[in-house]
From Swiss-Prot:
One of its GO terms (cellular component) is cytosol. Its EC number is 6.3.2.4. It is found in: Cytoplasm. This is D-alanine--D-alanine ligase. The gene is ddl. Keywords: ATP-binding, Cell shape, Cell wall biogenesis/degradation, Cytoplasm, Ligase, Magnesium, Manganese, Metal-binding, Nucleotide-binding, Peptidoglycan synthesis. HAMAP family: Dala_Dala_lig. The keyword Aminoacyl-tRNA synthetase does not apply. PROSITE patterns: ATP_GRASP, DALA_DALA_LIGASE_1, DALA_DALA_LIGASE_2. One of its GO terms (molecular function) is D-alanine-D-alanine ligase activity.
């Protein structure tokens, strides 16, 4: 295994708002790779400069960073310049998928379904936006993940406060219409869609706390959909990743209405790999252990 992969750096931690989640993801990945006999080492970009990777002779990188500075194309660009292969999507797709607004623009231009939205700023007519999108409305930073800075607005008078909260995290804030239905997530590995996971939060609010620090959210995998319907959604997910230029692995979130209509929400190019994370759960149902999943992701490390 050491000869196959060489010296591997697992990048985790970083300085984004999702640092704590990344620390959990990276520790799990590192333990799995080392357990499989890979010469893997921890590397926190918040504590060490990236150029050290080249100086210390690393052969490839497993990116377990989340949020800005980790899955937005910046680290990927640095690794491209150093000529060190890395896991996941390349520079362009990473930057694009991190931007919820432009991701939606691409999806819509390709005829893919996604909820209606508006970009908010200090001069927005919040009452008009509430009337146009209807209530409830989800408000979130354009460039954050893990529901950081996100709010579910149930009254028009709450919209400005929700924008102010999201604006603490990002200069760009998006308001998205609420779509009622099943919340699903769909991981993919290379050109293969993994089993869908249905997410059932006890209060219907799958926020940061529910994602990583509580056990009261129910995850159904298999998701319970008829095979033909699940396969159609998996095909949609693969197309949604392809039009963004994603590669390697990732996870898309979507809503399925009671009428059976899907709406794409977000694309994650460096999903969580914690004990609560959904990609390992889906892979397990597909017959892959966590160790096998990490090795498969690492095997896909590349440049370009």
């Amino acid at each position: 295994m050491k000869q196959r992969f060489g010296k591997v750096a697992v990048l985790f931690g970083g300085s984004s708002a999702e640092r704590d989640v990344s620390l959990m993801s990276g520790a799990a990945v590192l333990a799995a790779l080392q357990g499989a006999g890979v010469d893997a080492h921890a590397f926190d970009p918040a504590e060490r400069d990236l150029h050290i990777l080249k100086e210390e002779g690393y052969d490839r990188v497993f990116i377990a960073l989340h949020g800005r500075g980790g899955e937005d194309g910046t680290v990927q660009g640095a690794l491209e310049l150093m000529g060190i292969p890395y896991t996941g999507s390349g520079v362009m797709a990473s930057a694009l998928a991190m931007d919820k607004w432009r991701t939606k623009m691409v999806w819509l231009s390709c005829g893919l379904p996604t909820p209606r939205y508006a970009i908010l700023d200090a001069d927005s007519d919040f009452d008009a936006i509430a009337r146009d999108l209807g209530l409830p409305i989800f408000v979130k930073p354009v460039h954050e993940g893990s529901s950081m800075g996100a709010t579910k607005v149930t009254e028009a008078g709450q919209l400005r406060a929700a924008w102010e909260l999201a604006a603490r995290y990002d200069s760009l804030v998006i308001a998205e219409e609420f779509i009622s239905g099943q919340e699903l997530t769909a991981p993919f590995l290379d050109d293969r869609a993994l089993p869908l996971v249905r997410i059932v939060a006890p209060d219907g609010n799958y926020d940061y706390q529910h994602k990583y620090f509580t056990d009261d959210t129910r995850y159904d995998c298999p998701c319970g959909l008829p095979q033909a319907e699940e396969e159609a959604l998996q095909a949609l997910i693969l197309k949604s990743a392809r039009v963004l230029g994603c590669r390697g692995w990732g996870r898309a979130d979507l809503i399925l209405t009671p009428e059976g209509r899907p709406y794409l929400l977000e694309m994650n190019t460096s999903p969580g790999m914690t004990g609560h994370s959904l990609v390992p759960m889906s892979a397990r149902v597909a017959g892959m252990s966590f160790e096998a999943l990490c090795l498969a992701i690492l095997a896909g490390a590349r440049l370009g």
